[in-house]
């Protein structure tokens, strides 16, 4: 099962994850530099993992999938070793 949420990346390279029902633009005061969607799941070894993708229409910001997936995995302690 995959769980999809939204996120923003702040200028301090921190990820803020929130439910899909909330608009990205609700976080505009945080001065996001990118935004999109994050999917959570389980990898082939049974460990939690995540993946960032998409864009925010309400903020007009794209995601940077590879960079932001790494940021998310580091901050959420989901590194694939």
Please place each PLM-identified region on the residue numbering:
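Intrinsic low-complexity, intrinsically disordered or marginally ordered coil/linker segments
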Residues: 1-81
């Amino acid at each position: 099962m995959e769980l999809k949420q939204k996120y923003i990346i702040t200028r301090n390279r921190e990820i803020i994850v929130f439910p899909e029902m909330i608009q990205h633009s609700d976080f505009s005061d945080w001065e996001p530099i990118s935004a999109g969607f994050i999917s959570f799941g389980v990898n082939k070894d049974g460990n939690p993992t995540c993946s960032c993708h998409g864009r925010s229409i309400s903020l007009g910001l794209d995601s940077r999938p590879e960079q932001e997936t790494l940021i998310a995995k580091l901050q959420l302690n989901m590194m694939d070793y």
